[in-house]
Amino acid sequence: MADLVPVLTIDGPSGVGKGTVSKIVAARLGWHYLDSGALYRAVAVAVDWAAVDVSDTTALVKCAFDTCVNFAECADGEMRVLVNAIDATDVLRMETTGVLASTIAAISEVRAALKERQQMFRRTPGLVADGRDMGTVIFPDAQYKVFLTAKAEERAQRRYKQLMKKGVSVMLGALLEEIRARDARDVCRSVAPLKPADDALLIDSTCMEVDEVVAQVLALVTD
């Protein structure tokens, strides 16, 4: 029966705004929300905490299977992520965590270990899933698919403003370099490379406001 539950996938590179758009769309539709990136980041945190050697595939896969990840919504609507019962939300948002998550996500055995866990989020009345391979690998039969993109320079600017607003001092050039490096890893990896599904709606958000992107995505589902 899970196959009958409607799914909207929103894929795209790092820093493109998938999470922001997906959360708004899920709330408007009244559907569940899967942040697949948070799941990979949670495993990355567990790997770091356990000092697992990233070259030890067997240990990484065991960590992916064993790590307990829970998403808890606070009264203010903010989502907190618990890794093995410890609130790791702030750690998940660190740039170093993102880099480690991208590294382990390139390992086929790790992706296989997390595939079923992601598919279990498919529940009535529907699911909005954001990530990099939601429409191509995890939910290839999804009724609605979006591939969101933006120029690397624009994504770096957005991330720079986010971090500065939080009081985190960063160099714009370093952020841009990191985004380009992550794009290269995601696109060139042999397993589930970042690419739009053949039947995905392509949206370039470089010169768009969030509400404009949300409107296009909602139109895909409701029209």
UniProtKB/Swiss-Prot annotation:
GO terms for cellular component: cytoplasm. It catalyses: CMP + ATP = CDP + ADP; dCMP + ATP = dCDP + ADP. Keywords: ATP-binding, Cytoplasm, Kinase, Nucleotide-binding, Transferase. It is found in: Cytoplasm. Its EC number is 2.7.4.25. GO terms for biological process: pyrimidine nucleotide metabolic process. It holds the Pfam family Cytidylate_kin. It is an enzyme of class 2 (transferase). The keyword Transferase applies. ATP binds at G12, P13, S14, G15, V16, G17, K18, G19, T20. GO terms for molecular function: ATP binding; CMP kinase activity; dCMP kinase activity. InterPro entries: Cytidylate_kin (IPR003136), Cytidylate_kinase_dom (IPR011994), P-loop_NTPase (IPR027417). The keyword Kinase applies. Belongs to the cytidylate kinase family. Type 1 subfamily. This is Cytidylate kinase. It comes from Xylella fastidiosa (strain M12). The gene is cmk.
